[in-house]
Amino acid sequence: MASVHGITVKNAQGEDTPLSNYQGKVLIIVNVASQCGLTNSNYNQFKELLDVYKKDGLEVLAFPCNQFGGQEPSCEIDIAAFVADKFKFEPTLFQKIDVNGDNTAPLYKFLKQEKGGFLVDAIKWNFTKFLVGRDGHVIKRFSPTTEPKDMKKDIEAALQAKL
């Protein structure tokens, strides 16, 4: 697999979605959970980032995951409704996946190969963020505690790179 563009994932409705649909875009790929202490700040700041940078080609791809403290027990429809209602935000939401272990989604295998974590490659918690360039390669991996607003400099650099 040369880039994320060679991977197909399932959207929140369960339909195959090739990530090649996002070729030429800068992506934030993030594992999300509705009942996490990091939920509010991340969703609010993702919305703010998209309000500013979507016109330049930024997309946030949110992958619900229930592997950390069981903090995403809901189905995709309920997750989308929760985020839209509470945050007035409609991220591009995909089907719930595993990001670690035997059933790790192919996308997350690729992301972790491209940018391993500190000490271990495993995703450590909800809201681990990967910034992916227009070419489909991971530019940087951000820890769960990194706030989206603190990614601005890297996002702007990625948006300016016309690969």
UniProtKB/Swiss-Prot annotation:
Q: Which residues form the active site?
A: 36
GO cellular component labels: cytoplasm
Which EC numbers characterise this protein's activity in its record? 1.11.1.9
Keywords, ordered alphabetically = Cytoplasm, Oxidoreductase, Peroxidase
BP term (GO), one: response to oxidative stress
Q: Does the keyword Disulfide bond apply?
A: no
SUPFAM superfamilies referenced in this protein's UniProt entry, alphabetically: Thioredoxin-like (SSF52833)
Q: Which GO terms describe its molecular function?
A: glutathione peroxidase activity; peroxidase activity
Work out whether the entry's keyword set contains Transit peptide.
no
Q: Which Gene3D superfamilies does the entry link to?
A: Glutaredoxin
UniProt cross-references to InterPro entries, sorted A to Z: Glutathione_peroxidase, GPX_AS, GPX_CS, Thioredoxin-like_sf
**Principal localization?**
cytoplasm
**Where is it localised?**
Cytoplasm
Q: Provide the reaction this enzyme catalyses.
A: 2 glutathione + H2O2 = glutathione disulfide + 2 H2O
Q: What transmembrane ranges does the database entry give? A: none
What PANTHER family does the database record attribute to this sequence? GLUTATHIONE PEROXIDASE, GLUTATHIONE PEROXIDASE 2
- In UniProt terms, what function does this protein have? May constitute a glutathione peroxidase-like protective system against oxidative stresses.
Q: Which family does it belong to?
A: Belongs to the glutathione peroxidase family.
The entry's protein name is Glutathione peroxidase 2
Give the gene name.
Answer: gpx-2
